[in-house]
Swiss-Prot record:
Quaternary data: Monomer.
One cellular component (GO) term of this entry: mitochondrial inner membrane
Species this chain originates from: Saccharomyces cerevisiae (strain ATCC 204508 / S288c)
Stimuli inducing this protein: Expressed in aerobic conditions and under genotoxic stress. Expression is increased during respiratory growth and regulated by the heme activator protein transcriptional activation complex.
Active site: S230 (nucleophile), D392 (charge relay system), H424 (charge relay system)
Region (Disordered): 20-41
GO BP term (any one): phosphatidic acid biosynthetic process
GO MF, any single term: phospholipase A2 activity
Name of the protein: Cardiolipin-specific deacylase 1, mitochondrial
Amino acid sequence: MFKSTLNSIIRRPLKGFQLLRGADSSNTRPQSPRASARDVTEKQILRTPSAPTAIPLREIIYRVPSLFPRPLEDSVKDFRDFIKNEDAFQTELLKTLPFYPTPSESKTARLIRTVVDDEGNYINEFCIRPRKTSVPEADLKHLVFIHGYGAGLGFFIKNFEDIPLLDNEWCIHAIDLPGYGFSSRPKFPFEYPRDNIHSVQDWFHERIHTWFSKRNLLNRPEKNIVMAHSLGSYLMALYLQKYKESPSFKKLILCSPAGVSYRDFNNTASEVEKWKPPPWWYVKLWDRNISPFTLVRNFRQLGSKITSGWSYRRFKHILNGDPEQSKRFEALHRYAYAIFNKRGSGEYLLSFALKCGGEPRLSLEQQLFDGKKSDILKNSNCDWLWLYGDDDWMDVNGGLRVSRFLKEKLKQKSNVIIVPHSGHHLYLDNYKFFNNILTKEMQKI
């Protein structure tokens, strides 16, 4: 049983603990001021990326001290602090920003909980506003951040810090998806394969739409941009389908989107041969929602130490510089531990949306961007931007095909950009370029 549980830590995640070879994990190349984002034409065919592959169990055991670097005493303290006040882990991270909780000269920010269903469940939001707006409230523009699988709004900390509010006309909203982060975590009402994916999607979409409505973002949808990452991109593309007659935003930016297309080997035997299906027990764990988060919750005092197997490699090389950045790294690790340790809920969407190994059960290309279904989004009047890291394991070729479909069949604006020196978490790996892209998109609204 322990062997099976430990092996669940190496399932091929969208964002989970990457004790993996070839994954977007530890040492992303440093940013270069001379590098530039790259537009990709729809005629280009790029290397088909491979999903992360697992390290053998024996190697994991041998490398335990280096794989989980959090000191034991710190891990125990994190557990005790979580029991005492789990909400403090979020505020501790956000307090590393220069405008929270005390406003700066130009920005103010606050945490907001918006009730989104009859059971009293809420969506957690971090809202950044200009201290003095230059336009009437109704004319403010809005940028909404939506995270991916297993993540939370705190992972956008480097974007919050640097993205300008452009003439004090913009508000930034970062939300935790229903059942994620510090949003309420009700018992997930679905079970795979008993329930179908469309019911699960509706559960998310209706609550997200209620949040848009209650936050008065539906009054002027032409002033809204949504930036969604990974599995959040998958959800928000399908959200457009559900509310196509009354869209909630003008532009959708899909950051390393999950579930766009099925695996494409470019018809080469070598690529087909390299890909091996996961073993049957691996698939069973995936379908039963046995994840690294299960380990974090069940191992109690060791949960933060287990979390460090992902967080130290993901964040440390980016944030660990001067003392202030080291303080932020510590807060970011503890934040990651807290959201991984909270009750499982929204994360169980994963087994409905994706097969073990990252293949979509129903791809966006099949559901939305098929020639036989060209009328699904034709009235959405939404602009699209597809962002991929140059070392991303999400397949840019699917984004290229879909972008071409949007432009040629639906006559909608769509573009694909590859961000240099970044992987799946490009919003963090190369946040300067990423923030610059978002700022340029904001200027177009």
